[in-house]
Regions:
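C-terminal membrane-associated helical module and adjoining short loops/tails
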Residues: 1-9, 14-17, 135, 153-156, ...
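Alpha-helical transmembrane segments of integral membrane proteins
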Residues: 5, 14, 18, 22, ...
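Intramembrane alpha-helical segments
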Residues: 5-9, 80-170
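Membrane-embedded alpha-helical segments that form the functional core of polytopic membrane enzymes
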Residues: 20-68, 104-107, 117-131, 176-201
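Residue-level recognition of pore/gate-forming positions within transmembrane alpha-helices
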Residues: 23-24, 54, 100, 127-130, ...
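Short helix-capping/hinge motifs at transmembrane helix termini and TM-loop junctions
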Residues: 30, 34, 110-115, 137-138, ...
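Hydrophobic alpha-helical transmembrane segments
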Residues: 38-49, 65-72, 89-98, 125-137, ...
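Multi-pass membrane catalytic core of lipid/isoprenoid biosynthesis enzymes
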Residues: 51-52, 70-123, 214-251
Length: 310
């Protein structure tokens, strides 16, 4: 039982649940609502396979990250270490390869190879990026943050591209597909930007261990104040877009959506912005990271409104 609990902590079970919830809400509140009268046969089974493929690849990524981060984690979070303390490194690397392989196989089973081969290649690339992120990108300026943010957005984009033809994805006269495209990139864009914000905050939180092992993260290279400015700019951009979006949907009388978004998404972002300036200690940045994660959650939950309004 102790090993099972350790394994679930190693693969970040709450994060995997959040990822699955994102894809499930996207499927049932957006895709199914838009295409309710024309959902192709077998769509649900393909979707389920893709969800598990995403979860396995993400779990493998968390494992390989811990595998290569043992020295840094001994400084930043010694009480939370799993690999080499509760689970042997050999078992960790074995689980990484098994889960990565399972994720790629499930992707291939979920999609017709002739039409969707590029998505199988994309998920193979995700596995490779997670490995390179853990060994190189994570310790470099901005690159690691961008990679993780792109992979976060990909959890939504992979579902979108599995359902539409690549040639028609970015330009079509079909009203439903245009609506599907816009909502996909709205949420993928939100996921990308909020991840950029959180990764930069986590870099400030992890400075003690990162600096000891010569990582070139943003706060180490540019300084904490410059990193705060970077985070603040993205926060302002995201809040501005969300405010404009609320004004836009008011013309359709989406009162409940606006009443939810302002206190549950926009206000917490403003709180992060205000707290950011005075944050100095590791605990301060940890608190900001936690609030940012909460905003990711409340943002994804807003998909529920499209089930009622579309």
């Amino acid at each position: 039982m102790r090993l099972i609990a350790a394994f679930l902590r190693m693969v970040r079970l709450p994060n995997l649940f959040f990822m699955a919830l994102t894809q499930v809400l996207f499927q049932f509140c957006i895709f199914n609502t838009i295409y309710k009268n024309s959902i192709p046969s077998g769509d649900l089974s393909r979707f389920v396979l893709l969800v598990f493929a995403s979860l396995f690849i993400a779990a493998a990524g968390y494992i390989i990250n811990d595998y290569f981060d043992i020295d840094i984690d001994e400084v930043n979070k010694p009480d939370k270490m799993i690999v080499d303390k509760l689970i042997h490194r050999r078992w960790a690397i074995a689980w990484h390869f098994m889960l990565s392989g399972a994720g790629i196989i499930l992707t291939a089973l979920a999609l017709p190879f002739a039409q969707k081969w590029y998505l199988i290649v994309a998920n193979i690339l995700c596995v490779a990026l997670l490995w390179i992120y853990s060994t190189n990108f994570k310790k470099s300026l901005l690159t690691g943050n961008i990679v993780i943010s792109l992979l976060t957005a990909w959890t939504i984009l992979v579902i979108f591209f599995s359902k539409v033809e690549l040639a028609d994805a970015f330009g079509t006269e079909n009203i439903n597909q245009t609506k599907f495209f816009r909502l996909t990139f709205l949420y993928a864009g939100f996921a990308f930007i909020i991840s950029l914000i959180r990764e930069a905050i986590k870099d400030m939180e992890d400075m003690p261990g990162d600096s000891k092992y010569n990582c070139k993260t943003m706060p180490i290279v540019w300084g904490v104040n410059a990193t705060k400015v970077y985070v603040a700019v993205w926060l302002v951009v995201l809040m501005a877009v969300l405010v404009i979006l609320q004004v836009y949907v008011l013309q359709f009388k989406w009162w409940l959506a606006v009443a939810y978004s302002i206190p549950a998404i926009i206000l917490p972002l403003l709180i992060i912005l205000l707290k950011l300036r005075k944050s100095i200690r590791t605990q301060d940045f940890h608190q900001l990271s936690t609030i940012t994660k909460l905003v990711m959650f409340t943002g994804i939950l807003s998909m529920f409104f499209f089930y009622y309004y579309l």
